C-alpha cells in the first residue's frame, strides 16, 4: 500500500515536533518549490529551490524565532495537495517579545516526496513583536 500525501505531511510534522530536521528533509524532493511569505528581513522568507536550501531554511529559523508552541491542527486532504491549518507561539529574537499566530501551510506531494510548500502566517503579529 502506498503512502498518501496526508501521511507524508503528517510524518514531516511528527519529525519536526521531535526536532528531527533530517527526518523532515528525507521527505522533501531534491528539487522543490519551497516558499514562505513574511517580512523580507526574516531569513526564512522567500523562495528556496533545493533540499539543501530547505535545510538552510530550517537552520535560519532559530536565529530569529524561539518557537515555544507549534500545533498543526487540521489536515485538509486534496489528493496530491494538503493544506494544514495550525497555530504557534513564538518569542522573537532578539528581545524575546512573544507573539501568537495561526498559520496556513500548503503542500504538494508526488512520489512520496514534498515537491512544494507554501507557508503563511500573521506577519503583522510577527512585525509587532520585532518592533
Task: Tell me what each language-model feature is.
Residues 23, 29-79:
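A solvent-exposed, acidic/Ser-Thr-rich amphipathic alpha-helical stretch
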Residues 2, 21, 51-54, 100:
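A structural signal for well-ordered alpha-helical scaffolds and beta->alpha junctions
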Residues 1-30, 128-131:
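Short, low-complexity N-terminal intrinsically disordered segments enriched in polar/charged residues
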Residues 9-12, 24-25, 32, 50, ...:
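Hydrophobic pocket/interface hotspot
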Amino acid at each position: 500500500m502506498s503512502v498518501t500525501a496526508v501521511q507524508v505531511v503528517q510524518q514531516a510534522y511528527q519529525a519536526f515536533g521531535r526536532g528531527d530536521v533530517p527526518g523532515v528533509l528525507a521527505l522533501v524532493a531534491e528539487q522543490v518549490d519551497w516558499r514562505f511569505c513574511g517580512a523580507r528581513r526574516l531569513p526564512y522568507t522567500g523562495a528556496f529551490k533545493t533540499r539543501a536550501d530547505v535545510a538552510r531554511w530550517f537552520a535560519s529559523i532559530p536565529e530569529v524565532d524561539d518557537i515555544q508552541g507549534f500545533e498543526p491542527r487540521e489536515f485538509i486532504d486534496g489528493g496530491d495537495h494538503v493544506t494544514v491549518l495550525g497555530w504557534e507561539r513564538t518569542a522573537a529574537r532578539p528581545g524575546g517579545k512573544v507573539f501568537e499566530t495561526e498559520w496556513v501551510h500548503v503542500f504538494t506531494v508526488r512520489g512520496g516526496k514534498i515537491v512544494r510548500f507554501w507557508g503563511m502566517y500573521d506577519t503583522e503579529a510577527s512585525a509587532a513583536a520585532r518592533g
